[in-house]
């Protein structure tokens, strides 16, 4: 009896001593499992990663190239009386803005631009990624598939962000003055109804959807040709190749869609005068001739080209670091 009791007491004591160690090990194991579960959960949502990568890339490009968008809007908003006998160029508008509104005036409309571009670019890349995964099943898109994917993804983003696009255009024109984005939304809704928040949406889609479709086609086809044409390529050169392919694709896509951008701007700035696309196109041609459809083409081409090239370069790099194929 005495001998059997002693080991029992030792075993109980040993269990008491071991229990903190076991609890710590169990706690560490649970924490390890929690981390693994968290990582696994994140891996189950690649579309969210694509959205975040797109939003970050959109933020960087918007901050850098906002002045070009403002100059483009000001050039397109010029009336025939403002032009006079001499043609007003981007440099003249730039100097006027700096002289009358200071250097920071070039970033007027930054708030709606950020509100539009950050989620807008995120929605575009998220929709594009999910569409690729669903329809392509991992194989690279053909030229036609790239056009369709780009147009569809941009249309989704364009419809979602249309009210902010209207506000951004009016901010940049210098004609309208709103206290805040909310005040602008309320003012437009009260004076023009819900249609005012989607003013120029058709022209916007006619501009953005073909641009994104053509851009994605030129970008993906050029990038594939360049990367496949080199047997061994330094990894440090890939961002430069992505950026160069983006520049090439942006120039071509910008020139094709420039007339739709001019029509969109006039419809959003003067909704009473330019009520539908055909009327807007007729009045622009009557007042400015064929050249009127290409007002602001230089700053727009620079901005859209550089912005898209940077957005895609940042997006490709971030997706690669997250272990996802863009």
From Swiss-Prot:
| Keyword vocabulary terms for this entry | Membrane, Mitochondrion, Mitochondrion inner membrane, Repeat, Transmembrane, Transmembrane helix, Transport
Q: Which GO terms describe its molecular function?
A: glycine transmembrane transporter activity
Q: Give the GO terms filed under biological process for this record.
A: erythrocyte differentiation; glycine import into mitochondrion
Membrane topology, record value: Multi-pass membrane protein
Q: Which reaction does it catalyse?
A: glycine(in) = glycine(out)
A GO cellular-component term linked to this record: mitochondrial inner membrane
Q: Where in the cell is it found?
A: Mitochondrion inner membrane
Q: Which regions are annotated as Solcar repeats? A: 45-134, 141-225, 237-321
Name assigned to this protein: Mitochondrial glycine transporter
**Provenance organism:** Mus musculus (Mouse)
